[in-house]
Design a protein with these regions (language model features):
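Conserved class I S-adenosyl-L-methionine
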Residues: 1-35, 43-47, 66-69, 73
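Conserved Class I S-adenosyl-L-methionine
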Residues: 3, 41-43, 158-256
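Class I SAM-dependent methyltransferase SAM/SAH-binding core
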Residues: 33-87
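A short acidic, Gly/Pro-enriched loop at the edge of an enzyme's catalytic core
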Residues: 88-96
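A short SAM/SAH-binding and catalytic strip from SAM-dependent methyltransferases
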Residues: 95-109, 131
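Helix-to-beta-strand junctions that scaffold the AdoMet/dcAdoMet cofactor pocket
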Residues: 105-106, 119-121
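Conserved catalytic/acceptor-binding region of the Class I
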Residues: 109, 116, 124-194
Length: 256
């Protein structure tokens, strides 16, 4: 699946706020090395550079378009194109920062302990994942995909996202490997001045990508029209024409 840094950064302030909240929860320990896995266009990496000015900070992402944008943003930082599930470096890294990325990877029960293994004692694995699959925005993606002439073409699109497990499940996975595990859920309510069409633009940069990428231009246009019609029903505009987009996110800070 390809990614567009330009589309993703259309809502950069809103997408960066959870990264700030995640970073604020990392214990104030001495950090010599930090890596931003799934760094995107470098907005979250920039926060790590600010928080840990004396540390060696790096970023990696599977998208060359995202890495190109990150390198332009932070030319002093090393960025690598790499898939997290094939990332073989052993570290250790004092901080592994995974903001809005692990929901695209399977088998969290194996993945998370493997990431903790790359930490030294006292190091932190910081994770934030959108918990949105049961929100109207994402139910509508699946419904439109199943109902249209593209149903066969999109039969595997929904499966590209991993369902976020419960807090207790993640605690049980991480606690045997960690001295402390903090988990919390926050629902942001983002005001979007563009109304329902703003919701469509938001998810064109993330959740809609597996559904749009297999389609040709005409199919994509028709899909988005059907999706917008559903969004208009699920997220009615307020008096000023804007909408509030509820966006739940699960946070984990696991200290080895």
């Amino acid at each position: 699946m390809s990614w567009s840094a330009r589309q993703y950064t259309a809502f950069e302030d809103e997408r960066t706020r959870p990264a700030r909240d995640l970073l604020a929860a990392i214990p104030s320990a001495q950090v010599h090395s930090a890596i931003d896995i799934g760094c995107g266009p470098g907005n979250s990496t920039e926060l790590l550079v600010e928080r840990f000015p004396h540390a060696t900070v790096r970023g990696l992402d599977s998208s060359s378009d995202m890495i190109e944008a990150a390198r332009k943003r932070l030319p002093q930082v090393r960025f690598d194109v790499s898939n997290i599930d094939q990332w073989s470096e052993t570290g250790p890294f004092d901080v592994i920062f995974a903001n809005a990325v692990l929901q695209w990877l399977p088998d969290h029960a194996s993945l998370l302990p493997a990431l903790v293994d790359k930490l030294p004692p006292g190091g932190s694995l910081a994770i934030q994942m959108p918990d949105t699959l049961n929100q109207p925005s994402h139910r509508l993606m699946r419904e439109v995909a199943a109902a249209g002439p593209w149903a066969n073409k999109l039969s595997g699109a929904a499966g590209q996202r991993t369902e976020v497990a419960s807090a207790s499940d993640y605690y049980s996975v991480l606690r045997p490997h960690c001295s402390r595990v903090d988990i919390w859920l926050t629902t942001y309510h983002h005001p979007l001045a563009a109304g329902p069409s703003g919701i469509v633009e938001w998810f064109k940069g993330s959740g809609l990508r597996p559904f749009l990428e297999p389609l040709n231009e005409r199919e994509r246009e028709t899909f988005l029209q059907a999706y917008l019609a559903g969004v208009e029903q699920a997220y009615p505009a307020l008096e000023d024409g804007s909408v509030l987009l509820p966006f739940p996110r699960l946070f984990i800070v696991a200290t080895r």
